[in-house]
Amino acid sequence: MNLYFGDIPICYSHSTAMVLQAAGYDFRSDYLEAIMAMGNGATLVKKDDRHPLVFFDNGMPDESISHCLQILGFDYEEFFCDSSEPVNVIELKEKLKKYLDHGSVIVGPLDMGYLTYNLNYNHLQGVDHFVSVYDMDEDWIYFHDPAGYPCVKMDFRDFCKAWKAEAIDYKRGAYSMWGNLQRNKLPTSQEIYHSVSVIMKQRYENGEVGIIEDYAKTIRANGLNAEQKQLHQFFSFRLAAVRSLYLSQFLKDYDPVRADLKEKIAV
């Protein structure tokens, strides 16, 4: 099947691709998305007897960015802190500046409800997002937003409100960033495949059991409410489909059985 390229919310893969490209490494977003192996299994994100919410993944974007860089042979610096800890904005700015001395920086998750240049920000509270930061000065931060906003200029203190990611549960911590990327290993394609397979296996083994089956039973009994319909129509189904498609493309030369299975899941 042909690959799909279009408006899909894989901001963490797009931002990683932009930062890698700025450092002189060309990796397409679909390839990075496959290596991150996000689209396997399912996670219950809202418990409700009649209308629960389920995401069709079982990995966090911030952890997946780190896994992806490691799999591809990159050394890098990363930072995040406990969301409950107070943060000195001046110290945070200095750390980001130090990262920027070595090139662009992956930053996120951000809470899109604070990204006021996006006309829909009022409806995006608690939605996670990642961007590629390429510069900053005394008051402003400059970045590319893969949601359709290149060359954004934003007040740094306002940006920090989004960067705290207080309303986002699926993260390692607040104020996360990755920078100073240097590729010191050149793994073979077979080695990359093996590393991805190990992560997929671990995520399936550590994931919750029976979520999709239980979710289907609940839908049969109670139908879908407006929140569920909106989530699946505008986000989760199309994201799950493209993740399966990209992973199918990645697996086809090494594991045609699983590649075929992923393609069937996509359609």
PLM region spans:
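Cysteine-nucleophile protease catalytic domains, especially the papain-like/related folds used
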Residues: 1-89, 181-182, 187, 192
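Short, charged/polar micro-motifs that form catalytic or ligand-binding hotspots
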Residues: 5-6, 55, 123, 230, ...
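Short, contiguous, pocket-lining structural segments
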Residues: 11, 125, 236
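Exposed alpha-helical structural elements
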Residues: 15, 31, 64-67, 91, ...
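Residues that form generic nucleotide/phosphate-binding pockets
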Residues: 22, 35, 68, 95, ...
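Active-site-adjacent substructure of cysteine-protease-like catalytic cores
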Residues: 25-46, 51-57, 86-136, 144
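Noncatalytic regulatory segments and standalone regulatory/sensor domains
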Residues: 138-242, 247-253
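Long, low-complexity C-terminal extensions of enzymes
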Residues: 248-249, 253-267
